[in-house]
Amino acid sequence: MHGTVSLRLTDSPARDEIARHAVIVLAVRVGMPPVAADRAGTAVGAAVRACRGGVVTMTAVIDGESVEIAIEGGDDAWRAEWTAALGAFGALAQAGCLTLSLRRTPLRAL
């Protein structure tokens, strides 16, 4: 499946939970195990919660076995802090947004 999902998250008390659940669904869709998907969702939810004021926009591009997520919002300090915190998910700060990539963990033969 290929597609794009966009969320516009206004400054409300529930936006971190909305972001968390959206990331969990996307991660499971591309084949991540549920525990890993929950870990990714929780981390992104925390990042969205820490983003003060304004609107946060999340855009996810699904490409079969991976999903690329761009989070727009926050300032340079927020992006720098959360790029480090989301490093396990390949987070990068670029062009005014924070991007990360979620992929299925490849299985290895024993």
PLM feature spans:
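Bergerat-fold GHKL ATPase/HATPase_c domain
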Residues: 1-45
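Conserved beta-strand-loop-beta-strand hairpin that lines the nucleotide-binding pocket
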Residues: 1-5, 48-110
